[in-house]
Each structure stands twice: as structure tokens, then as C-alpha cells.
Amino acid sequence: MTDLHQTYYRQVKNPNPVFTPREGAGTLKFCEKLMEKAVGFTSRFDFAIHVAHARSKGLRRRMPPVLRRRAIDALLQ
């Protein structure tokens, strides 16, 4: 028998998070520019450098898992 916990295990509740703004809420131009720059931040070299720096200081042991990085990207939007 297969263990059900291994078959359906996920690291996050929503594996494909998406930012959805409120209806009727406007966004400032400055915020829109920041959101455009933040798209895909966790998959770029900059984020890898931040993680490497945190590892050198002893704050992290490894790069966050892919699903957690997707959640971070959604939060930056």
C-alpha cells in the first residue's frame, strides 16, 4: 500500500499563487513599476546572491524550495 501522506504532500497550500487586486482599487504608477521589476525575482541571480549572503552569515542553510519561491514572488506582486 502507498502512504497517502507521501502521495499528496505539498509544501504550501496553494502551489500556484497569483496576486489578484481588489475590484475597483487603483494602483499607483510607482507601485506598478515596482511590481513589474519584481516579476520572477526569486528565479534571478540577484535572489541567489541574497541567499548566498544569508548562508555566509549563518541565517539560512539552503535556497528555499520552488513552491515557497513562487509564494514569495506572489507576495512581491
Swiss-Prot record:
Decide whether keyword Ribonucleoprotein is in the record: no
Q: Which GO terms describe its biological process?
A: DNA replication; plasmid maintenance
Determine if Transport is one of this entry's keywords.
no
Q: Could you tell me the keywords of this UniProt record?
A: DNA replication, Plasmid, Plasmid copy control
Q: Name the source's superkingdom.
A: Bacteria
| Annotated function | This protein is essential for plasmid replication; it is involved in copy control functions.
Query: Any other comment in the entry?
Result: This replication protein is compatible with the repA replicon for the IncFII R plasmids.
Q: What is this protein called?
A: Replication initiation protein
Q: What is the lineage of its organism?
A: Bacteria, Pseudomonadati, Pseudomonadota, Gammaproteobacteria, Enterobacterales
